[in-house]
Structures are given as C-alpha cells and as structure tokens.
Amino acid sequence: GRVELLARPAIGLVGARNASANGCGFARKLSHSLCDAGYVVVSGMARGIDGAVHEAALKADPNAHGGTIAVLGGGVDVIYPREHRDLYGKLCEQGCVISEMPPGLQPQARHFPRRNRIISGLSYGTVVIEAGRNSGSLITARFAGEQGRDVFAVPGSPTDPRAAGPNSLIRDGAILCDSADVILDALRDATQNTHLFEDFHQFNTNARSPEVNSDPARYDDIAQSIVQDAENSGSKEPSQSIEIDSELGDLSPTDTDADQSGKVLDLLSTTPLLIDDLIRASELPANSISSILIELELAGRVERHPGNRVSRIAK
C-alpha cells in the first residue's frame, strides 16, 4: 500500500465487532471528518466499527492528505474476516495494510493484543466507539495510556452493553468524544509543531514518541490482566465475551435464520433507528428484515416507534 501514510499524523479508531448501526454511523462520521482534516485513521479491519472506519476514510477527500492504515492480526496477505476481501483490496490500493506477523500466518487470538499495541503506537490518540466491558478495544486504550497517548471515548446509553467500555473509560479519565472537533482540539498542540505536517511524503519511522517497551511478552501479560479484571467484574452478559478471544470465532459464518436475527439485533441499540437504515446496514432484503422484526417484537426483544423506527429493548 501507500507506506508514506505511516509517517503522517494518525488517530486510532477502534470498537465493537457487533456494533450497532448508530455506532457504525458515528464511526464513519468521525473517520471522514478526521481524514478531511488531514489525519490518517488507523484501525484493525475487523467487522463492525473497524470496517466502518476504513470504508469512510477511503471515501474522504483525497486532497486533504488523510488516509487509512489497517493493522492485521495475521500475515499481511491473509484476509480476515473473509467478507472484507473487497475492502482489503481497496486498502492495498488507496491505503496501507501492515502486520508484524510473517506472511501467510493465519490470525490467532494471541496475536490481537499485539496488533492493538501497534494501532495505539502509530496514533497520537485512540478513540473507543462502542465496546463491551470485556472488549479487546479496551486493551488498545490501555496501551495508548501507557504509551503516553490521549484516550478518547464515545459515551453511550447505560442500558446498552456496548456502551459499558467507553463509559468506564470516561469515568477513569478518558476524554469524552462527541464530535471530531473534540479530537482535533485535543491533539492540535501535539501536532502543530511536528515536521510530519511539513513533509507528508517523507517516510520517517522515528517520528513517533515517546519510546515504549516493545517486548511482545509484556503485552500478552497486559492483555491477560484486562481479561482477568473483566472476569472479576462479575459480568455474565453473553455478548460481553472477551473479544480478543472471539475475533476468530466465526471464520466461516453461516446465514441461517438465527444468524440473521442475531445480526439485526446486534445492529440495534436502545436509540431508535430508521428501519431503512437497518436494511442498509444489515445488507438483508427488506422482506427478511420485516419478518425478523416481527419475530423479535413477539419475543420482546425490540420495540417499534413512530416514524418507522425500531429500537432494542434493554434487558
């Protein structure tokens, strides 16, 4: 890909794989705005938030000198998830794809904390958009803090499990992020004097600071400590499984009715969403969405609202 992107000012955007449509929409908005402001956005090419971030960045104004970098958990030539094959191709042409793993190596759960460390290390700040209490995105946030980077979190409804991670980060001192302006204002002092803005095309791997411990085993220990903290928190919500372990849980996804219902439910949050937007986000036929919503409504999982909107019912 375009290796010169590695020398440009970057911001990491990470979040849930089972992100809601509203969460993905906000991720796209942030990504597009940051790229238009001249930043490179960095993410992990996973489902959900990551994919939305990369897709929006690729559509941003090319004259703004933004761009996007995908950090993979396997070899740089291994496409995961499989449905991101087209996105991978576009990233190789218009963005940059990197990995510290050898070519051909299939992704494994233990690789993802190391990938997350690279995402935060490349970035002046890391933004978490929707993440469960046990999400692997919180590993990226912790790495960012240890590396001296800013940590931003997008707040969410306390009734949505996917807001537990960002809300917790905000309580712990992360910067509340409700627009790209918050990020740009916070990072302006950090970037206004750097030579990175003066010569976008000079590849300089020494531009990032501060220096951090690069011992891979250390990052495995950090990841394990986060997992342990999550287990001790007493959260038993099925959707809150540790995402660094579940990244590989569906290499061969099926398309059964149960899978489609789960996909629709994952896209919904307690904030009402237009059914038309749900159809676009799910990429399912309108008649299938209609049937699924009826089933979920009868099961007490979703609620309809005026204006052809629907929301998930909090448990």
Give the positions of each predicted feature.
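Glycine-biased, small-residue-rich flexible motifs in mid-sequence functional cores and linkers
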Residues: 1-315
